């Protein structure tokens, strides 16, 4: 398992694009990529942007969430190309972008007020629990 922080997202995804072109591990060996950008908010619905390859296992996320009730709903969207999972999705890596938009902290995202003090961490535990449960069941 790798935890990777990319630089250059707001400059055309330069960091993630470079890594996707020069991976430490061959991309076809990545079982699933999780993009956890912008999850510090309190909306009870979790926004999920899912790659085409990621859709093969996405029903498992829905099943786990239905069983455990981590979020009111998983609000699935098509790829938008505006975050670091996108260069991997274009290369057929299964991935999901979790973003908690529309809560009380969303108005601060990508502004000078996007600070620790204005972040809301209530959705961290359910997000990570959902991911841990998913990984433990992934075939």
Name each model-derived stretch.
Residues 1, 105-139:
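His/Asp/Glu-rich mid-to-C-terminal helical/loop segments that flank catalytic regions of hydrolases
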């Amino acid at each position: 398992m790798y935890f990777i922080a990319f630089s250059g997202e707001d400059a055309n995804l330069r960091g993630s694009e470079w890594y996707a072109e020069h991976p430490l591990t061959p991309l076809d060996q990545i079982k699933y990529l999780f993009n956890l950008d912008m999850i510090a908010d309190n909306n009870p619905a979790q926004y999920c942007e899912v790659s085409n390859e990621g859709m093969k296992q996405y029903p498992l996320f829905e099943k786990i969430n239905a069983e455990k009730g981590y979020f009111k709903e998983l609000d699935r969207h098509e790829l938008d190309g505006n975050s670091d999972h996108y260069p991997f999705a274009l290369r057929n890596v299964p991935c999901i972008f979790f973003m908690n938009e529309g809560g009380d902290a969303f108005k601060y995202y990508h502004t000078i007020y996007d600070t620790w003090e204005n972040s809301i961490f209530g959705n961290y535990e359910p997000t990570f629990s959902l991911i841990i449960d998913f990984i433990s069941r992934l075939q």
